[in-house]
Amino acid sequence: MKMETFLVCLFHNADGLHQQIQEILYLLRMHIYETNLYLKQELSRLIYPNRQLSFVLLMPLSLLRNWDDIEYLTDVVDDKQTLHYAANLLTNYVLHLSMFQKLTKPYFLLAVKRVSEKLNKRQRHSFYEVLVTSETLNNYENLSKNILNTLMFAVRYVFKPTPNYSEILAELEKKNKIHHIIFNMVIADFAQIRKQQMDKHLCETNNELRQECKETIFDLKVVGNV
């Protein structure tokens, strides 16, 4: 089943979903505590044999509208390799749902936050790198500003405990992965805006860039009030 077909089916005809996806929806609705081994085993059985199903598992979150289910989902994932994969899934989640105007930011951000809390400082850098350099974002210049702003806002949650941007950029610079999206995220950090209003070094000499900074800051403030 094509992803676009699946999404239409998911949002308009949940009864027509594949049997395995129905099982996942059922398990997520059971409201069983994360200590329940049976539920963990069942989720593992459905998730790990097929990575496409791992991706699908994130999709129903906007339908369930239940914080407990979403928190449980991110708690189930323990190993770091899977967490890195989860970063890609979260990115795809934003992009695909945006296409159907079904994006609900709080639910996406909670998943990002819960995953990032499991990682130490170095692992958060890696998680961030996966999030912003995902294959899905290789053509980031063609993405709408709404999607980019949502991703940037999510990235702030990953580093909320210690948002040391100079260190993050230094790490990424070593790997030649400085992207436009990273630049936007750095200049649009709320604390930095309050202290400096805008990064003079980057913006004052370039009218076009300065205007883009202002637009990004405004958009992020709007997103922050959602």
Curated annotation (Swiss-Prot):
**Record has DNA damage as a keyword:** no
Q: What is known about its induction?
A: Expressed in the intermediate phase of the viral replicative cycle (immediately after DNA replication).
UniProt keyword terms in alphabetical order: Glycoprotein, Host-virus interaction, Inhibition of host NF-kappa-B by virus, Signal
Provide the residues annotated with a glycan attachment (glycosylation). Answer: N142, N164
What is the annotated signal peptide range for this record? 1-16
**What processes in GO biological process is this protein linked to?**
symbiont-mediated suppression of host NF-kappaB cascade
The record's function comment reads:
Plays a role in the inhibition of host NF-kappa-B and IRF3 signaling pathways. Mechanistically, promotes the degradation of host IKBKG through enhancing its ubiquitination leading to inhibition of both pathways.
Q: Give the family, as the similarity comment puts it.
A: Belongs to the asfivirus I226R family.
Tell me what this protein is called: Late protein I226R
Name its species. African swine fever virus (strain Badajoz 1971 Vero-adapted) (Ba71V)
